[in-house]
């Protein structure tokens, strides 16, 4: 056992120093000779000109057997587990800078992007420019000639390109529609109710004999008091101070204290999830030193983040355990309970969980479909947020019915796949909890189906290729 531990530690130490293309040591000088992954012209300066137009372009570098630089690019790109695709790059092009090279367009053969899925994906996402098809057709030829001229002059390589979208200084801002107004209206209503509820709670405290902060920790009774209408618990349900105390109050029941250790697992799990998603986002946005992330993937501890999806299993296990304990404790199903009553209990418990999660999920969908795209503006912002705006408006039903994990293509908020998987496993766990306690065969069969379901989804995601819906992460 000690020898295996020594081998593991030695492997970890050796892995810290790993950093190469496919073999040998990492050479930063050779690395910097390759075309950078992202090169963006000054966005604000370009659009400061009234006639300025800025285009974000996806570029594929064409093979060139006689070029040593191309062989280096191809060698690096083959290591897909640790390296970016350096033969696929993004360029932010200010067309005013390209016009001097417009006479050179005829010198280059106009290559077309072969990835039809990518073209279809961009067509579905960037619908704002449908009315400018003639204008974009001219931009297409101009951008291709400009980029080919630059790559040929600097790297002796040729390219084919695809305009993702173009923005002109004369383009009007995105107009507000009914969905935008609905979201803003909901925000205003929630803010107004919160202020009124907090003020009412403050007034009740002033009228009460208990003036300390303990007033907010005690539940109010629904009675006519101090000349106020009944239903005080409902009217103060949006009180900021009262909800804060409810959030941080200690556990009182024995069961809550017994399972309080789950909070530690939750904190560790949430920390790992947030850290993993943060690293994922940094790998999909323009960065100055992509070699840092590539070298980071060679390190031993990186395997923790690469297998971060396994951390999610902690939440599945906790969810199933708490469901079983609560279900057994309340004894809603007895050995003599009839089938119809079991079905009624199933739908009652499922509906309670469904409608408890739905408001927060709808709020996320509305935010991504309306406000998210307006928070910032820049050369890469639409690339990151436009898909969310479009798909959250058209494919919201995948999230509402919790089937996102089965239908990731063109889905809204990919990260909500967990809610879909958790809800489906919750249904299976609920069925297993209602299985006849006298018939262990039924219980074990249901649990086996749950395990097979989880394993099947994991293996399908591991072996099947990504579709166009997640093409964003492939780039």
Please tell me what each predicted stretch does.
Residues 2-264, 269, 276-312, 316, ...:
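Exoplasmic/lumenal regions adjacent to the first transmembrane segment
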Residues 11, 62, 100, 327, ...:
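Generic hydrophobic alpha-helical segments
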Residues 66-67, 102-106, 283-284, 325-327, ...:
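Intrinsically disordered, low-complexity regions enriched in proline, serine, glycine
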Residues 98, 283, 323-328, 332, ...:
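Short amphipathic alpha-helices and their capping/turn residues within compact interaction modules
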Residues 188-192, 264-278, 307-322, 354-371, ...:
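Hydrophobic alpha-helical cores of multi-pass transmembrane domains in eukaryotic membrane proteins
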Residues 241, 292-301, 387-410:
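Extracytosolic (periplasmic/ER-lumenal) interhelical loops and adjacent juxtamembrane/interface segments
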Residues 331, 342-345, 394-420, 427-475:
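Aromatic-enriched alpha-helical transmembrane segments of multi-pass intramembrane proteins
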Residues 379-393, 453-456:
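Intrinsically disordered, low-complexity regulatory tails flanking kinase catalytic domains
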């Amino acid at each position: 056992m000690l020898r295996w531990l020594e081998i593991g530690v030695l492997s970890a130490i050796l892995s810290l120093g790993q950093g190469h293309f496919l073999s040998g040591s990492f050479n930063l000088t050779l690395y910097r000779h390759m075309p950078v992954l992202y090169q963006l012209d000054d966005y604000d300066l370009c659009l400061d000109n009234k006639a300025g137009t800025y285009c974000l372009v996806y570029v594929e570098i064409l093979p060139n057997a006689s070029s040593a630089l191309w062989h280096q690019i191809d060698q690096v790109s083959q290591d897909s587990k640790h390296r970016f695709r350096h033969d696929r790059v993004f360029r932010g092009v200010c067309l005013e800078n390209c016009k001097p090279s417009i006479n050179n367009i005829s010198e280059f053969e106009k290559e077309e992007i072969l990835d039809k899925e990518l073209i279809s994906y961009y067509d579905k996402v960037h619908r704002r420019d449908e009315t400018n098809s003639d204008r974009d057709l001219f931009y297409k030829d101009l951008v291709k000639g400009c980029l080919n001229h630059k790559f040929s002059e600097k790297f002796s390589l040729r390219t084919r390109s695809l305009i993702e979208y173009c923005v002109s200084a004369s383009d009007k801002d995105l107009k507000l529609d009914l969905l935008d107004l609905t979201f803003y209206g909901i925000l205003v209503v929630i803010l107004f109710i919160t202020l009124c509820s907090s003020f009412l709670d403050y007034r009740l405290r002033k009228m009460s004999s208990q003036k300390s902060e303990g007033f907010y920790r005690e539940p109010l009774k629904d009675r006519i008091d101090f000349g106020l209408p009944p239903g005080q618990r409902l009217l103060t349900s949006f009180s900021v101070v009262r909800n804060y105390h409810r959030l941080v109050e200690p556990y009182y029941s024995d069961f809550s204290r017994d399972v309080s250790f789950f909070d530690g697992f939750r904190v560790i799990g949430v920390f790992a999830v947030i850290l993993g998603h943060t690293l994922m986002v940094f790998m999909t946005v323009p960065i100055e030193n992509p070699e840092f992330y590539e070298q980071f993937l060679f390190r031993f501890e990186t395997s923790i983040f690469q297998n971060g999806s396994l951390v999610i299993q902690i939440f599945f296990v906790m969810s199933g355990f708490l469901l079983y304990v609560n279900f057994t404790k309340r004894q809603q199903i007895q050995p003599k309970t009839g089938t119809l009553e079991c079905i009624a209990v199933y739908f009652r418990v499922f509906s309670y969980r469904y409608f408890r999660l739905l408001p927060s999920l709808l709020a996320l969908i509305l935010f991504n479909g309306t406000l998210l795209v307006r928070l910032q503006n820049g050369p890469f912002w639409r690339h990151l947020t436009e898909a969310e705006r479009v798909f959250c408006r058209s494919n919201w039903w995948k999230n509402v019915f919790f089937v996102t994990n089965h239908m990731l293509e063109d889905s809204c908020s990919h990260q909500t796949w967990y809610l879909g998987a958790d809800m489906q496993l919750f249904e299976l766990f609920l069925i297993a909890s209602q299985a006849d306690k006298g018939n262990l065969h039924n219980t074990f069969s249901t649990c086996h189906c749950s395990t097979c379901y989880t394993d099947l989804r994991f293996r399908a995601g591991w072996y099947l290729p990504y579709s166009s819906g997640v093409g964003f992460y492939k780039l």
